């Protein structure tokens, strides 16, 4: 200072003129000069210089704040960010600022916090109202915008590079970054964090766009269109159906592909491709395969060309996105489009669907015209053939079992019961006859009354069994009414004729086509299966009529192999369950004899078994008629007489005198109530009934009376061991029994020698 101003006196005089260094105004006003010490002035000068320096530092803060505001106003957003960063750095490190009062610092910091929020809000507004315009029904992207009152030109790529690098350098928001951590206002800090998270979620990860596209592609009732000039995707509802629906779905997906390929920046194309690509690949391939019959309706189908175009665009999308989490070569779709064999197979699928619909329409007829019965000729086999299958050799009783086994092997229906399977029915599940009857009644109650009456009238089946005849075991439930038709004719519904027409039409549609033979056979079997399933559902209580219809249908077309198999299974399943019920009822009755032999209840036989046999087995099989009806009736009688009764009784250890009468009465009831005139000419039927009736006759007799029957030749149908087994079961081991057995051996042995 002295070097600059050597004249100290002059300096002092000049300073005395400055009112700031006067001690008080009164002294000056009095005109008295203040004598100041030079050292005092220097001290004061130092203080003023320090204050000036502080003010100069604080002025720097003001300049930075103005710089931030200016950059923000002119949308120099990156410069604004760096200016704000410099301001925050000075606020952390500037000693002059840190020496200011807390209130001063708090005021400055709060104001700077608003600058943070203002900058982020500007970024958010430019994204939401500038580059992107996303509504519930549209997505529009603009790669370059003019923003603000000065129409500042902003490029999307540059803008997003800045946002990503400065705010999300690690791909996510860092809550420890200076931009958030340096803020002191919790409210402003939370607002900044929320807006940055929204920017990250919706404009970096494009989650909202991903969701909108994902929820609209490959979905019927949704449509997407792309307006190239405005670069906008428009989402709307669609009411198209069938082929138009497929076309709408495909064009919607093409619109999305075009938008991603031509309308987006690389960074966003890559993001959407990464998020949606695997879904695109899977759903597009799946959709094309599921709708191939529509897409490949003709060799030059426009949908086929559309799929090919989309397939190529999807391949381009993979390449232009440079993602690694999915691939799409397009080969699978292209091979599918070029596969003519597949085209013909899909055409077959379409024809099959239409024919199944035609079958369904038959049963949807409110008039039920398919139930109308017509009389057709019954195809019958030679009666001798039946006798050969089930008959027995009169001269050799022992050969009966061998012949029986041979019949079973030759019998395609496999209903004859072999000796090794005698206990098979005992191994079956327990069947509650009461539950079965209740279930049947409940099912019948569900049917319309008119339909039930119509079937009853058509079948002429008396549903009401005479109570008096059930109460009295002596009253016979005769089972020889086979209807009013002659033996060479039978009634069928309209179903066989209707299906024959459908079947013929189905086959003729591909008479000269290139459809794979195995595939055609598979679909033809599927047509038959569908027909049989619908028939079964509509014949739930008239299975015998269904069998008659199916048998007639098979006679008209022997190549209906699937229907033939299902028809056989139908009859076997129905009879199988009924056989089980009969077997259990017999066992109930035999158990009643053992437990209460002197006063047994006959309800199981009279109230349940006999009516059940007549109504559920004999009558339906009589209605079936033909070779099958006779064969199954014979099989049932063999099962009833031999397996259910004879073999079960022979398992007993001993038969008391009282139970011998009970058993004889049971056999008598069964014989009298299974007199079937349809089988009257069958030799095997006559022998079976005669042997069973003979058993019922000798059961209550004394040994002497039984031996008289033996001497008279009444046991010619019984093998020697079988007859002796009965005698040992009925009578105690006495000399009389031993003599009787010896006589049987002697006479039978002599007869064999002769």
Curated annotation (Swiss-Prot):
Residues 1-200 are annotated as: Interaction with TIP20. Changing residue 425 to A: Loss of interaction with RET1. Changing residue 455 to A: Viable and no effect. Lethal and loss of interaction with RET2 and reduced interaction with RET1. Residues 406-440 are annotated as: Interaction with RET1. GO terms for cellular component: cytosol; Dsl1/NZR complex; endoplasmic reticulum; endoplasmic reticulum membrane; nucleus; RZZ complex. GO terms for biological process: endoplasmic reticulum to Golgi vesicle-mediated transport; ER-dependent peroxisome organization; mitotic spindle assembly checkpoint signaling; protein transport; retrograde vesicle-mediated transport, Golgi to endoplasmic reticulum. This is Protein transport protein DSL1. Residues 406-459 are annotated as: Interaction with RET2. It is a peripheral membrane protein. Residues 425-454 are annotated as: Disordered. Required for protein transport between the Golgi and the endoplasmic reticulum. May tether coatomer-coated retrograde transport vesicles to the ER membrane through interaction with coatomer as well as the SNARE complex. May contribute to the stabilization of the SNARE complex. Keywords: Endoplasmic reticulum, ER-Golgi transport, Membrane, Protein transport, Transport.
């Amino acid at each position: 200072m002295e070097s600059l101003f050597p004249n100290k006196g002059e300096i002092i005089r000049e300073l005395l003129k400055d009112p700031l260094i006067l001690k008080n105004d009164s002294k000056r006003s009095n005109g008295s000069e203040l004598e100041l010490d030079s050292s005092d002035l220097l001290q004061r000068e130092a203080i003023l210089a320090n204050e000036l320096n502080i003010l100069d530092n604080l002025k720097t803060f003001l300049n930075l704040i103005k710089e931030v505001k200016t950059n923000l106003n002119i949308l120099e957003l990156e410069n604004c960010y760096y200016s704000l960063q410099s301001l925050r750095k000075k606020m952390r490190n500037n000693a002059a600022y840190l020496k200011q009062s807390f209130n001063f610092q708090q005021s400055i910091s709060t104001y700077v916090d608003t600058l943070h929020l203002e900058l982020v809000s500007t970024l958010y507004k430019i994204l939401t109202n500038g580059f992107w315009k996303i509504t519930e029904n549209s997505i529009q992207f603009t790669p370059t915008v003019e923003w603000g009152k000065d129409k500042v030109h902003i490029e999307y790529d540059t803008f997003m590079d800045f946002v990503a690098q400065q705010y999300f350098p690690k791909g996510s928001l860092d809550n420890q970054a200076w931009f958030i951590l340096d803020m002191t206002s919790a409210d402003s800090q939370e607002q900044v964090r929320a807006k940055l998270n929204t920017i990250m979620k919706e404009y970096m990860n494009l989650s909202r766009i991903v969701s909108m596209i994902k929820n609209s592609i490959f979905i019927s009732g949704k449509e997407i269109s792309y307006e190239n000039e405005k670069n906008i995707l428009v989402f709307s509802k669609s009411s198209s159906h069938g082929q138009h629906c497929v076309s709408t779905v495909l064009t919607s997906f093409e619109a999305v592909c075009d938008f991603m390929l031509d309308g987006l920046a690389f960074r966003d194309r890559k993001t959407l491709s990464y998020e949606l690509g695997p879904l695109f690949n899977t759903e597009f391939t799946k959709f094309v395969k599921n709708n191939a019959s529509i897409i490949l309706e003709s060799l030059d189908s426009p949908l086929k060309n559309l799929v090919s175009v989309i397939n190529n665009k999807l391949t381009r999308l993979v390449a232009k996105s440079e993602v690694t989490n999915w691939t799409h070569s397009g080969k699978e779709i292209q091979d599918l489009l070029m596969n003519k064999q597949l085209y013909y197979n899909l055409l077959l699928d379409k024809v099959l669907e239409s024919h199944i619909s035609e079958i369904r329409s038959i049963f949807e007829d409110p008039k039920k015209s398919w139930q109308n019965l017509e009389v057709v000729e019954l195809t019958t086999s030679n009666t001798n053939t039946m006798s050969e299958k089930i008959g027995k050799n009169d001269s050799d009783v022992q050969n009966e079992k061998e012949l029986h086994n041979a019949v079973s092997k030759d019998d395609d229906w496999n209903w004859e019961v072999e000796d090794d399977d005698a206990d098979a029915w005992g191994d079956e599940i327990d069947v509650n006859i009461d539950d079965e009857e209740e279930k049947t009644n409940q099912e019948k109650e569900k049917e319309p009354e008119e339909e039930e009456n119509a079937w009853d009238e058509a079948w002429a089946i008396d549903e009401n069994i005479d109570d008096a005849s059930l109460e009295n075991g002596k009253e016979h439930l005769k089972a020889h009414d086979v209807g009013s038709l002659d033996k060479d004719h039978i009634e069928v519904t309209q179903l066989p004729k209707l299906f024959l027409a459908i079947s013929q039409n189905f086959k003729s549609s591909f008479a000269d086509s290139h459809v794979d033979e195995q595939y055609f056979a598979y679909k033809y079997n599927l047509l038959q299966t569908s027909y049989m399933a619908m028939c079964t559902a509509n014949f739930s209580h008239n299975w015998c009529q269904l069998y008659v219809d199916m048998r007639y249908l098979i006679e008209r077309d022997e190549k209906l192999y699937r229907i033939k198999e299902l028809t056989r299974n139908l009859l076997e399943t129905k009879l199988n369950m009924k056989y089980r019920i009969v077997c259990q009822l017999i066992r109930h009755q035999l158990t009643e004899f053992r437990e209460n032999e002197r006063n047994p209840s006959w309800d199981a036989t009279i109230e349940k078994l006999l009516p059940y046999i007549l109504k559920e087995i004999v009558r339906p099989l009589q209605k079936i008629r033909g070779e099958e009806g006779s064969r199954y009736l014979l099989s049932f009688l063999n099962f009833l007489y031999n397996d259910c009764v004879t073999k079960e009784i022979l398992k007993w250890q001993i038969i008391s005198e009282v139970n011998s009468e009970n058993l004889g009465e049971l056999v008598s009831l069964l014989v009298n109530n299974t007199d079937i005139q349809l089988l009257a000419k069958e030799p095997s039927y006559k022998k079976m009934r005669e042997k069973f009736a003979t058993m019922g006759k000798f059961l209550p007799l004394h040994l002497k009376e039984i031996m008289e029957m033996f001497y008279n030749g009444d046991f010619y149908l019984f093998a020697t061991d079988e007859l002796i087994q009965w005698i040992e079961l009925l009578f105690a081991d006495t000399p009389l029994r031993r003599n009787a057995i010896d006589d049987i051996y002697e006479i039978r042995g002599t007869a064999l020698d002769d």
